[in-house]
From Swiss-Prot:
Keywords: Eukaryotic host gene expression shutoff by virus, Eukaryotic host transcription shutoff by virus, Host cytoplasm, Host gene expression shutoff by virus, Host nucleus, Host-virus interaction, Inhibition of host RNA polymerase II by virus, Nucleotide-binding, Nucleotidyltransferase, Phosphoprotein, RNA-directed RNA polymerase, Transferase, Viral RNA replication, Viral transcription. Residues 55-64 have a biased composition (Polar residues). GO terms for cellular component: host cell cytoplasm; host cell nucleus. Phosphorylated by host PRKCA. Belongs to the influenza viruses polymerase PB1 family. This is RNA-directed RNA polymerase catalytic subunit. HAMAP family: INFV_RDRP. InterPro entries: RNA-dir_pol_NSvirus (IPR007099), RNA_pol_PB1_influenza (IPR001407). It is found in: Host nucleus; Host cytoplasm.
Amino acid sequence: MDVNPTLLFLKVPAQNAISTTFPYTGDPPYSHGTGTGYTMDTVNRTHQYSEKGKWTTNTETGAPQLNPIDGPLPEDNEPSGYAQTDCVLEAMAFLEESHPGIFENSCLETIEVVQQTRVDKLTQGRQTYDWTLNRNQPAATALANTIEVFRSNGLTANESGRLIDFLKDVMESMDKEEIEITTHFQRKRRVRDNMTKKMVTQRTIGKKKQRVNKRSYLIRALTLNTMTKDAERGKLKRRAIATPGMQIRGFVYFVETLARSICEKLEQSGLPVGGNEKKAKLANVVRKMMTNSQDTELSFTITGDNTKWNENQNPRMFLAMITYITKNQPEWFRNILSIAPIMFSNKMARLGKGYMFESKRMKLRTQIPAEMLASIDLKYFNESTRKKIEKIRPLLIDGTASLSPGMMMGMFNMLSTVLGVSILNLGQKKYTKTTYWWDGLQSSDDFALIVNAPNHEGIQAGVDRFYRTCKLVGINMSKKKSYINKTGTFEFTSFFYRYGFVANFSMELPSFGVSGINESADMSIGVTVIKNNMINNDLGPATAQMALQLFIKDYRYTYRCHRGDTQIQTRRSFELKKLWDQTQSKAGLLVSDGGPNLYNIRNLHIPEVCLKWELMDEDYQGRLCNPLNPFVSHKEIESVNNAVVMPAHGPAKSMEYDAVATTHSWIPKRNRSILNTSQRGILEDEQMYQKCCNLFEKFFPSSSYRRPVGISSMVEAMVSRARIDARIDFESGRIKKEEFSEIMKICSTIEELRRQK
């Protein structure tokens, strides 16, 4: 049946139809090839906005650096990064005046966190620049490699397991004249295969030691690797994002902890909360402004957009902010927090893989690595690339570009929010000392500004003053992209406000559908997404019911598990029909085994196995939930799992769903081809690391809450825990005497082996 789309809108208020204009159906665009060009764009753009600053040379690395701080005040509307130190400090002082004790309390909270955080905090997060191998790695591997190198260079403070001690090692590593690292390389040789008698290439992975001098080490420690941001909708051009290395990460974490603690106490901050909590917070600010604008006052709201937020932020400003926020705090604490901005003032951007060249005529392809861009003849490049390279050349050192001004994407979201809020805070009448006043919301680079005044001229004057105040701290409100409306209608972080927040349902569209993890998880995730959208996003009962039917249909086509009594022929239909015929209670079969769907919008919260358990044949129950079933490699299933769902904007969200372990919870095996590459050594390291961590979790399940504290190795901690548990179990009669003595014997053997090592 064809539906005339205009009919859909007859009964819908205009603001609810906003979601249909979003570019959120279909696949998002992904980037291909290298991000080198995008990174050069970022570096060049950042320098352009600060071009009237002062040039200096870093004495350690020889990198040229541009410092725009306290530079000339802009005379036009072009974006610029010339923040004025005294203005930033004053904004901080006024923020503290309006919120007495806010900085002090946040510092105390952060000091506590700093003293307690374990180094394994750094294993969170995805790709991390691994300076030992000069490329990206999973965070856990990159951390393990860093610690291994530190250890072999005599830096062992980190073995206490505290993050702060690891950071001491980082500081000491920067003073060393040289550092020895282990890198992976691969050898290829031609050998004759015994079976086929053909010649084959055999690859072996070697590890080799390499010495790095102080300058090279510093460059690596200060390097941010860059990648292209994928899956970004509604944009024509891609852009680069940065992944910092392990040396920077810990310091950034502490700064962001402090800033997060401050943001939590600021009513104008859209971070760190999200979802419904964020909506409630925002609605409060709007309510305050609307109730205060009595009948005599006008109230307008700007849906704001800042031009090139990251490129105009400056680490030197962040240093000034931190210095102010942490005044009167212990010296060690002030030092540890000031290191992140200092490192960012000296950061280097790695240009990525370089350029690919191909000659159609000679069928040749060759890669020009980023390291060669400094010296290669530019005649091979097209006009625009040539300009980029010419501009960036003076900044290049070893394939990285010196990038002192600017903050790469997503590094100091919380701290930059504090800066934004400090300007919103200046809108109170006691500061504007006139008839207009403002307030608003800030979340990283996104803002909404509410201005109240007795007449239109006052509104205009208020907006102008806000605009100019922002310029003083390096924030550039875009006059082209911001728009003003009567208060009551605006957009902030993709939430649409119209006398209350309107559900922007289209943003959730990408997360509907079959995830492709396995039959068990996919069913659970699918119904949970529908349930969550009924709770949070105005998904009505009729639409939800339809979404559910579409999901089941999609699910059956994905796993070829149509009902046992259907006429549809697939590869699985023969087996499923057989199962259907020999099952007495057909309602008990899971959908993935050709059973009927028993879900409706009232029971979405119940896992399918539980929903059908009473209806199942006994032998089916036995097969389905049998951990000894030889056809299933089981992962241990927690009662709640996390799935990654892709909402339409922002990062992938983690969503909890109920996981019931059945024979359908299989895990696909790793692709074999990786085992023949240079990644193999790394993969083995990673699996070892994983195994150790899993074992450790067994001894100290997160339910026991307290992490082992104190200076002991993982092995020692596990042995002592095993002894304590064994004694308790023995005394309470849960284990026999023989078992108890065997456990004690194993513990002693382990300790003996450690001593011999």
